[in-house]
Amino acid sequence: MTVHKSRIRRSRSLSVTHRIQKRPDHREKTKLYLQLKLHDLHTVFNLFPEYEQKFLAIIKLPITGKEPIDVPFSLSNHHQHTCLEFSPYANEQISKSACLHCESVSVPTSSDAMVAHLNQVNNVMQNRLYFYGFRKDMELIRMSAKQPTIFQIFYIVHNTINNIFPIMFERKQKLGMHIVFQSRTLHIPCECIKQIVAVSSGYNVYLDILQESVILTVLCETLDTNTNIHIDIGMLQKKLEEMDIPNEISDRLEKYKGHLIGFH
């Protein structure tokens, strides 16, 4: 009976030892990971796209995480999940997973911007920077009522990035807009670009550099004549006629207007 118990103990011991020996140690695991090739990852990501997003979220710097861009740069060429950075040294698309600026940034959605457009008659002073850009040109104001995209893009940018200045103009009997970023160093969050693209069907939206400023230009190519979106343009024009434009703003408008002639 004693011998039998001893054999059982030895048998269990050998079984446990065998299982332990089969488990790869840390060095073996590391060796296994190092054997993964780029084409292996590509195969996995093709089969399981959700893994690619998890992989990009985990790694801190995928390769360099950056790609140079040329200006003028159309937002139609923007890669998903990338931010845009402009500086005197480089203009780049930066992978969102490698971005260090966007964690605390809140960006309005296209729906938020549409609600703000519908309420603009009641919020003239709140949106006065936008209306300064019209220079009390009532014909441009009338055009804006039929092109909610112009206000939406301004609203999204203005609520994401400080120190901007809009200038409205007429092109081919449609309203266009320049947004002047009053700095040569600029970071545009990925989500901001995504929301601009979401509202800009029928528009050409691109970024360029003029002197020491980055310029976002919005050009209407196809006007949607079937829109059911309406605002009280008469009331809006009346409020804007009564609104004073500060001398500092008027001087800035004239300065930028002179620089931007022929820019679009």
Swiss-Prot record:
Tell me which UniProt keywords the record has, alphabetically.
Host membrane, Host nucleus, Membrane, Metal-binding, Phosphoprotein, Zinc, Zinc-finger
Instruction: Show the segment(s) annotated as Disordered.
Output: 1-22
* Principal subcellular localization: host cell
Q: Name one Pfam family in it.
A: Herpes_UL31
Q: Could you give one GO CC term from the UniProt record?
A: membrane
CCCH-type zinc finger segments: 83-187
What are the BP-aspect GO terms? Answer: viral budding from nuclear membrane
Kindly indicate whether the keyword Zinc-finger belongs to this entry: yes
Instruction: List compositional bias (Basic residues) regions by residue number.
Output: 1-12
Q: Report the subcellular localization.
A: Host nucleus inner membrane
Task: State the post-translational modifications.
Answer: Phosphorylated at serine residues in the N-terminus. This phosphorylation regulates the localization within the inner nuclear membrane.
Query: What molecular function does GO assign, one term?
Result: zinc ion binding
Source organism, top-level taxon:
Viruses
Quaternary arrangement and interactors, per the entry?
Forms a heterohexameric complex with NEC2. Interacts with capsid vertex specific component 2/CVC2; this interaction directs the capsid to the host inner nuclear membrane to initiate budding.
Database matches in HAMAP family: HSV_NEC1
Q: Tell me the protein family, please.
A: Belongs to the herpesviridae NEC1 protein family.
Q: What functional role does this protein have? A: Plays an essential role in virion nuclear egress, the first step of virion release from infected cell. Within the host nucleus, NEC1 interacts with the newly formed capsid through the vertexes and directs it to the inner nuclear membrane by associating with NEC2. Induces the budding of the capsid at the inner nuclear membrane as well as its envelopment into the perinuclear space.
**What's the protein here called?**
Nuclear egress protein 1
- Organism of this sequence: Human herpesvirus 6A (strain Uganda-1102) (HHV-6 variant A)
